[in-house]
């Protein structure tokens, strides 16, 4: 946000909360394509292979306001440059520009709201791994969870209407609405059979902002009910909700259900209720009974349908018992298992041995899902046998090794908090042998001959930082190295789940 401060001070319109003039500023689109602002740090930044013009972007925005701009035939669309091969390029530029502009007031409000609060290293709470220590502390004492698949809004207008209470600049909202409808119509004209959604990977930033803004409208109700039904008001709930691409308004709670509010508060009064969300999947955990969780299930469905115009069905919400079922959340298989701890107690001449069960929140690497992802990315077969990757065979040897090594390190980095790391070493074996097969295919050699040629330098590319530390202390103290190997480490610099398919 420091980069935006200098520009915003020059715009008098910003002092009056007018965002519309920023849309025609070229530096906004330059910031949108800045690699420093790209929050997907684990994904490769791919630059555009074609040149683009900011002047064309302004002309496209102006064209949206012209009358009869939707009356276009198929022949006219083929002759138009924008409806040609550069359509996706410029539409993505406008969508990213919109996302940057609308994010500015939300980010500044969030920073100002946190100024008086004693939250240490708030940016660390944006990390995905910040959720897992919270789950370890809370979920081991709970019984049931609601595994919720959050429904998508059925209409674009619902997303736009959500911003009306946040952004008072009417021209910006009108332009955003025009762009969303216009882009939807362009895709329907060009691709009659294959409909391209506006929420594609090319427009992911704008979609995430609109989607999270919509979800926050009813997630703020959870914070409201929680604070009203409990005397111990949590200060971390707002921080956990205000994650990446997500800006909350904790001080401006929504006034809803005035008539039935006392009944709802009695229903929601549960001091052991916890809520966590990542993207379109959320978890509502409680120490209550199955009957209470079933009431929560139908309450959420009615809340979405009656008050937020979002269609949902009860079958999208599953009730799971933590001690019996595993939870598939954020790439981990999690459950609560009992560990029997033997305790010996001695009183005078008599001694007793007791087995004390201790609940522990366990996180496991889903090896089947990982193999499926590696298969989709063409690193191995369905059975997990490594294969070469012909797409990368034209690269330099150093680039091939670096790519495979980076994927391996990223996976180890993300799954460092797993309680069972044996599956990770199977993944490392697949990636390492796939790398060798790719190099052998490029040089038309055998795998055995190429392994002798590479030597130990090749293996160092696949070493993680944790393994390097273990190798240094292994010869000195074996017990310490074993504790580090079994230890669970959660990093606070990971803000997205890495998708292997993006490396194809």
From Swiss-Prot:
Gene Ontology cellular component list: chloroplast
Subcellular location(s) per record? Plastid, Chloroplast
Q: Name one Pfam family in it.
A: MatK_N
Instruction: Tell me the keywords, alphabetical order.
Output: Chloroplast, mRNA processing, Plastid, RNA-binding, tRNA processing
Q: Which GO terms describe its molecular function?
A: RNA binding
Q: Name one GO biological process term.
A: tRNA processing
Its annotated function is as follows: Usually encoded in the trnK tRNA gene intron. Probably assists in splicing its own and other chloroplast group II introns.
Q: What family classification does the UniProt entry report for this protein?
A: Belongs to the intron maturase 2 family. MatK subfamily.
State the protein's name: Maturase K
Name of the coding gene:
matK
